[in-house]
Amino acid sequence: MKKYISNIEISTNQGTNAQIWENIFSQKEWGKYPSENLIRFIAKNFYNVKDRSKINILELGLGTGANLWFCAKEGFSVSGIEWSKTGVERFKQRLENENLSHHIQEIKIGDYEQKLDEFEDESFDAWIDGYSLAYNDFKKTKIIIEKAIKKLKKNGKFFSITPSFNNEGFIKDEKLPYHTCKPTHGSDAFTGIIRYCDEKDIKQLYQGEN
C-alpha cells in the first residue's frame, strides 16, 4: 500500500460514495491522527471526567479510525459506523496492535441512517462527524443528524465538520441534488459526490426537530 498517492491515481470517481471510499481505503494510507479541533472538543468536554471509560463516544463515518483511535487512547469507550469494510478492518487492527481493543463497544458497517437505529436512544455522551456526513445529500443528512441527536444522553454533545462552497474544486452542478458537487480537483477530488453548506443550510441541518 502506497503511503503517499493522489486520489486521481486510484479513483475513477464512479459508483456510489461507499464504493469509492472502499477503493480509496484499500489502496491508500489515510490520516492516522485527529484534527486539533476534535482534540479540543474532547478535552474541553470530557478530560475532567474521573472515569473516562464511562464516556461513550460514537463516530459517524470513522474511516480508518483516527478519531476513535485518539478517543480510545485517551481512555474513552468508542463506537462507530462506517461504509467501508476495509476502513473498519484497518481501525480494528491498529487498536489491536496498540492493546486498545477493549475500548471498542460497537462498530457497525453500513449506511448511517439505517445503522443508527441499531443503537439505543440516549446512550452516548457525544457523537462526532469529521466531514463524513458531507457525503450524504441534504435531505438524508438532516435525517441522520436528527437520529444521531436522539442517541445522545441528556446534555450530550456533538462535533461536526461540513464543507462550504468555497472549498477548492467545488463547482455547482444542476444535475446533482441540492448543494452537491463532484470535485475533480482540490483536496476532495475523486472522492465522490459531496454536499456543501451555506449558513442557512447549517441552521436547518443542525437545529434539530425543535
Predicted regions and their residues:
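Conserved beta-strand/loop positions that form the S-adenosyl-L-methionine
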Residues: 60
